[in-house]
């Protein structure tokens, strides 16, 4: 905004400084003083000049500044300056009674308004205690005063200037009132800069900010303004939500047609008769702006969180005792020593990771290996330096030439675009760097680079280093029938949790970007800047990824410059009725088609379905009517079927042709005598290794035990049960008990189990009954009353975990009790998902350091790909602890299982086969994977026998 307002036609005809602001026509104002403004000159701006403009603001320098070009103004600490224009954000236009020029805003602070030496500078003579007080004094609320809360607003002790602007219309809204005659001597000027606000707050301001400029004391006329005087909404803030930006765009002179937000219009207060109607409409609009699933159709399917952070940042205030400030979700931190500032003072540190580095830092001789860090300090009166600690994403080549030609350096600058100068006090151990920052400035930019010495073209610094880049997959909070995922490549390991994406469709340049969430990421070594092909695959045929198989290209020069590349992949669900979460596989190929990296990511779940509320009038029961309610005996309070313990009638029978007695006992391989009869659950065969070679096996029931029998040793005779069949009859209860024998030997992650159950179990009462907690009240599981059903399910699960881990009672297996309960309420889909997760995790733990051998047997994974799985889990020295070897093994197994498909039977069968192929296979000592294979192949038999295929007729009311 401008520091002065003059007519669009300058009567003097003199050139104007561009920073003095846009010309605003005040032809409707009768006061002659506003039309006779002269162009600024040094002589006209002296303190003793009575013709000084009313909107000149006095500031004091807090630090010396020596300019490096003729457009900036030199000043010393303690010198008084007079600001003419604050629209430049980080640079203000000011004068010092002798000359004019630009000054950095961080080097000055507004002078206390009560001690201002400008008698007519427009400073507030008596700062009001609250916004409401000023509103009442100026009669700005009109007829809405009774609707606004009388609670006092928090006093603005830090900012001497009140700054009303557009805001949430809920509390108080945008206001540009009509100004009546003010008392002589009372001048009100609400400045539009805040000395404590960050610099980006200024650059994002719009021309619709509310400004109550100083009018002459003798003004008796009203100023016409575009906003109605009786607008009830008023609040002071510096940021805008998507709703407010839509209002500002709609009110602009040249509205953008066909823009990104063309279909997302916020309701205007003038369209409604009462405040309550507008409040309801505004709430409905805000509800729509929460979860975007199609970036091209935001107007039809809106909803991204407009309050998400733009970049990874943190602000922390420390006292003289010191401490540390760590950037969230990164390995970047600043250590503040004790007595860094004097006792009683504080230091506010702002730390931000910038995604795109300056162009000068990436070329043939230099490349960035960390994000550019913006460090802002509030207190320059310090007694000790700061220490910056971060991790770099590069390793020097192993040969001696690489160590001599390339060095890791830390560069620092006072401006984002440079110039950058090296920092001498730097300590490197492994991939961790510590930098000692002295000569502190209010704003500093620090970055780590790999810089070559004596490198001659066509050689580059990339030939002497192993630089790691990160590929991250981003998407909306919930998946929808049509949404877009974004693959982003970063030149370092700091992939932010949220990413701004605006290269979508043919949107306007001024449209706000969309914030997506990080679904998953992986780091890999990029040998050189080259064209990369990024592909995205879905593991479900129901979802189609446009251009996913062919992939999209990232050019080598983009990687060389270190810029963040964002590739957008539209994803469409072929059958929206079957919408569910699924797995996406990310693959990165080099310029010759080789796979550099690939990993799998599980998408979020669809948004929860909300039931349609009845639109008819609600009738509440009277107190005396409650006791008269008689529930129908046909009413069903639980949607889950009842597990019935009854004989399994679908068995087939066979005659054993051979006697088998095993020397090495296996609880899942049967021993039997020739001539006996055995029951077979089905004629489907399982493949696994016997004593010497692979064989085919039936799942049989013999003498009260469930296990495997070699198919060649059985002659199938039919479904008729022979009279001489010995042993107890197979019932669903006995079958369930036999199936679940391997469960207690499987490893699980409780947090993952808890999340799955909370998402998939709809009734805590049915779940508790299945676990054996029949007729126990909710208070038995939780101390406080829980409102949501998911929290109640979680409390029941927590109770089960406590009882299984307690030593006093009979020892129970948490896994076995949980799977048994889920099978009793017919949650087979949830069971197989849990079983598969248990099996993959247990296999990873059992295989541990031998996972590379398993990877070769299952998928023929290259050594480079194996290194990629281990890279994220290595320590600072590049070593991978033996106890952590299960982590890359688990990552690989998740990726591999996603490639197999949706068949849980195939996943466990192929995993068993791969383990059997290993040298000294672990399945010889760890036999419970065989039992798990029996379990998943018996589920259908159990379900068919235990649950009726038809619902009872009285289940429908």
From Swiss-Prot:
Q: Which residues form the ZU5 domain?
A: 312-449
SMART domains (alphabetical): SH3
Q: Mind telling me which CDD domains this protein's record contains?
A: SH3_SH3BP4 (cd11757)
Mind telling me which SUPFAM superfamilies this protein's record contains? Answer: SH3-domain (SSF50044)
Which example biological process does GO assign this protein?
positive regulation of autophagy
Keyword DNA-binding applies:
no
What is the predominant subcellular site recorded for this chain?
membrane
Annotated localization:
Membrane, Clathrin-coated pit; Cytoplasmic vesicle, Clathrin-coated vesicle; Nucleus
Identify the keywords attached in UniProt to this record, alphabetized. Answer: Coated pit, Cytoplasmic vesicle, Endocytosis, Membrane, Nucleus, Repeat, SH3 domain
- Any idea which GO molecular function terms this record carries? GDP-dissociation inhibitor activity
What is one cellular component GO term in this UniProt entry? Answer: cytoplasm
The record, for Pfam families, names:
DEATH_SH3BP4, SH3_1, SH3_2, SH3BP4_C, UPA_SH3BP4, ZU5
Query: Where do the SH3 domain residues begin and end?
Result: 54-113, 649-719
What domain of life does the UniProt record list for this protein's source?
A: Eukaryota
InterPro entries, A to Z:
DEATH_SH3BP4, SH3-like_dom_sf, SH3_domain, SH3BP4_C, SH3BP4_SH3, UPA_SH3BP4, ZU5_dom
Q: Keyword Glycosyltransferase, does the record have it?
A: no
Q: How does the entry describe the domains?
A: The SH3 domain mediates localization to the clathrin-coated pits and vesicles.
General function of this protein: Possible role in regulating endocytosis of the transferrin receptor at the plasma membrane. Alternatively, may function as a negative regulator of the amino acid-induced TOR signaling by inhibiting the formation of active Rag GTPase complexes. Preferentially binds inactive Rag GTPase complexes and prevents their interaction with the mTORC1 complex inhibiting its relocalization to lysosomes and its activation. Thereby, may indirectly regulate cell growth, proliferation and autophagy.
Fill in the subunit field for this protein: Homodimer or homooligomer.
What this protein is called in its record is SH3 domain-binding protein 4
């Amino acid at each position: 905004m401008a520091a002065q307002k003059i007519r669009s036609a300058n009567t003097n005809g003199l050139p104007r400084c561009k920073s003095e602001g846009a010309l605003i026509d005040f032809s409707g104002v009768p006061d002659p003083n506003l039309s006779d403004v002269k162009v600024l000159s040094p002589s006209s701006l002296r303190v003793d000049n009575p013709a000084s403009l009313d909107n000149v603001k006095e500031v004091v320098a807090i630090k010396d500044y020596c300019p490096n070009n003729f457009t900036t103004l030199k000043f010393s600490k303690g010198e008084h300056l007079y600001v003419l224009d604050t629209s430049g954000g980080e640079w203000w236009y000011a004068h010092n009674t002798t000359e004019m020029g630009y000054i950095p805003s961080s080097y000055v602070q507004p002078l206390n308004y009560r001690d201002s030496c400008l008698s007519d500078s427009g400073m507030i003579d008596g700062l009001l205690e609250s916004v409401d007080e000023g509103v009442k004094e100026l009669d700005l609320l009109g007829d809405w005063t009774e609707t606004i809360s009388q609670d006092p607003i928090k006093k603005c002790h830090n900012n001497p200037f009140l700054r009303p602007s557009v805001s949430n219309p809920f509390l108080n809204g945008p206001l540009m009132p009509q100004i009546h005659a003010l008392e002589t001597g009372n001048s009100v000027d609400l400045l539009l800069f805040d000395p404590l606000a960050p610099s980006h707050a200024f650059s994002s301001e719009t021309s619709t900010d509310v400004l109550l400029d100083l009018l002459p004391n003798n003004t008796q006329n009203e100023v016409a303004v575009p906003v109605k005087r009786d607008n009830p909404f008023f609040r002071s803030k510096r940021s805008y939500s998507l709703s407010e930006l839509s209002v500002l765009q709609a009110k602009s002179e040249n509205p953008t047609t066909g823009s990104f937000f063309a279909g997302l219009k916020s309701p205007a207060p003038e369209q409604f008769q009462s405040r309550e109607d507008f409040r309801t409409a505004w709430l409905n609009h805000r509800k729509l702006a929460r979860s975007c699933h199609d970036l091209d159709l935001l107007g039809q399917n809106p909803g991204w969180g407009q309050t998400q952070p733009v970049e990874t940042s943190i602000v922390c205030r420390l006292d003289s005792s010191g401490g540390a400030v760590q950037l969230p979700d990164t390995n970047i931190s600043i250590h503040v020593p004790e007595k860094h500032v004097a006792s009683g003072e504080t230091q506010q540190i702002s730390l931000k990771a910038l995604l795109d580095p300056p162009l000068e830092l990436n070329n043939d001789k230099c490349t960035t290996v960390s994000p550019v860090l913006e460090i802002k300090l509030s207190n320059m009166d310090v007694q000790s330096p700061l220490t910056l600690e971060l991790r770099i994403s590069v390793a020097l080549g192993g040969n001696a030439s690489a160590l001599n030609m390339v060095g890791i350096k830390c560069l620092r600058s006072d401006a984002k675009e440079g110039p950058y100068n090296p920092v001498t006090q730097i300590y490197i151990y492994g991939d961790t760097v510590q930098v000692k920052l002295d000569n502190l400035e209010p704003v500093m930019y620090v970055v780590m680079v790999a810089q070559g010495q004596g490198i001659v073209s066509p050689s580059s610094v990339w030939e002497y280093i192993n630089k790691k880049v990160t590929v991250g997959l981003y998407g909306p909070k919930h998946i929808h029938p049509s949404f877009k995922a974004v693959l982003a490549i970063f030149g370092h390991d700091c992939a932010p949790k949220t990413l701004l994406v605006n290269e979508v469709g043919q949107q306007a340049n001024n449209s706000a970007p969309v914030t997506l969430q990080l679904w998953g990421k992986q780091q890999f070594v990029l040998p050189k800047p080259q064209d990369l092909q990024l592909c995205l695959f879905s593991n479900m045929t129901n979802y189609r990824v446009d251009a996913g198989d062919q992939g999209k290209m990232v050019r080598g020069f983009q990687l060389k410059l270190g810029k963040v590349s964002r590739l957008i992949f539209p994803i469409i669900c072929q059958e929206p009725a079957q919408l569910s979460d699924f797995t996406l596989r990310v693959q990165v190929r080099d310029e010759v088609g080789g796979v550099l990296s690939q990993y799998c990511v599980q998408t979020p779940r669809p948004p929860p379905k909300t039931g349609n509320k009845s639109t008819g009038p609600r009738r509440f029961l009277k107190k005396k009517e409650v006791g008269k309610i008689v529930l129908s005996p046909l009413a069903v309070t639980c949607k889950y079927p009842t597990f019935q313990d009854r004989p399994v009638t679908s068995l087939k029978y066979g005659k054993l042709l051979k006697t088998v007695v095993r020397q090495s006992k296996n609880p899942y391989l049967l021993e039997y005598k020739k001539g006996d009869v055995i029951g077979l659950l089905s004629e489907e065969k399982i493949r696994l290794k016997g004593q010497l070679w692979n064989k085919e096996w039936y799942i049989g029931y013999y003498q009260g035990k469930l296990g495997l029998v070699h198919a060649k040793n059985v002659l199938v005779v039919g479904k008729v049960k022979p009279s001489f069949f010995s042993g107890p009859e197979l019932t669903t209860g006995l079958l369930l008990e036999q199936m679940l024998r391997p469960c207690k030997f499987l490893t699980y992650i409780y947090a993952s189990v808890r999340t799955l159950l909370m998402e998939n179990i709809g009734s805590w009462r049915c779940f508790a009954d299945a676990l054996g907690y029949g007729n126990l009240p909710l208070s038995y599981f939780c101390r406080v009353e829980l409102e949501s059903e998911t929290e109640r399910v979680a409390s029941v699960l927590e109770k089960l975990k406590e009882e299984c881990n307690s030593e006093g009672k009979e020892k129970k297996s948490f896994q076995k009790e949980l799977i048994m309960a889920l099978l009793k309420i017919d949650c087979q889909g949830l069971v197989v998902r849990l079983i598969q997760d248990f099996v993959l995790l247990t296999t990873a733990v059992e295989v541990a350091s031998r996972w590379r051998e398993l990877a070769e047997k299952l998928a023929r994974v290259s050594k480079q790909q194996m290194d990629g799985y281990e890279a994220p889990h290595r320590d600072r020295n590049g070593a991978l602890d033996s106890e952590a070897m299960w982590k890359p093994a688990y990552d690989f197994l998740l990726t591999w299982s996603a490639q197999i498909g949706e068949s849980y039977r195939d996943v466990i069968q192929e995993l068993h086969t791969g383990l059997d192929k290993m040298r000294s296979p672990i399945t010889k000592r760890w036999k419970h994977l065989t039992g798990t294979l029996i379990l998943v192949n018996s589920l259908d038999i159990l379900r068919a026998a235990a649950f009726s295929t038809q619902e009872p007729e009285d289940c429908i009311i």
